[in-house]
């Protein structure tokens, strides 16, 4: 019973909020346009207008028809969207419907088997046995159907409301467009067509500039070869002693020359003999004192002259230092060492000069015997 009540309520709601069908929309638009057209033709102002009205009809009648057709298309679109939404929702309930069909079929099969029995006892016994099972299954089916009906009612109602709103909006837009066009048509019939403004001459299109030739793509530069990794510098070796420079190319080895005989070492120079010490000069012999002459007054003896100092011995010249031997150059054959120059012989010391002999004292002059001696 509950199922039937829900179904009746759904039908009532749908009848109240059902959207207009495409045919209904088309008929409503036609009636609206016809009504406006008759109103326009019956207008006193339009009837007093001039005869130049054909151009106005030629201009605005196609526009009015196009506006009505656009409104019909918009309404058809709304109806199609609503139908698609309803089909989508019904597809969702198909799975539940199939499961309920299986349960309903089991009830029908059980009760149908009872109807086919001819024996009265068997007939009532079958109904008694299947009644309890049928009631349980029917209760489950009823509950499931009630839930689905409530859900579908809400969903389908919302779909119908959206469709009606979309259709009404499309119809109102079509009415607004047709009203505006009828108003313009009325003004055109009363005042005539406005003089068309001279269309501005289209400016000559500028000649397209020749497209610049595409520059040839630069050839891809060859990728620079990776620089070789610098070899690790060898550790500095200790400087070897200077050796003869190696020849750039190995020449054939010459036959071994006989090794030069070692030069005899120079004999050591004889040391110079020590100079003999000068002999001491002999002291001069004392001169004999002259005999004193009888004089009244003896003259004092002259003092002996001082002996001349002996000249200092000249210092021996220093021996010249022997020149250092030149280092042998790195050559295949060493040069012989130069012989040291012989040291110069020391000059002999000059012999001491003999001391001058003392001059003899002058003899005393003899006094004249007379006082007058010329």
Curated annotation (Swiss-Prot):
Keyword annotations from UniProtKB, A to Z: Repeat, Secreted, Signal
InterPro entries xrefs: SDr-like, TsetseEP
Region (Disordered): 192-374
GO cellular component: extracellular region
Residues in the signal sequence: 1-19
Region (86 X 2 AA tandem repeats of P-E): 194-365
Key word Repeat present: yes
Composition bias, Acidic residues: 194-363
Pfam families: DUF725 (PF05267)
Location in or out of the cell: Secreted
Full protein name: Protein TsetseEP
Higher taxonomy: Eukaryota, Metazoa, Ecdysozoa, Arthropoda, Hexapoda
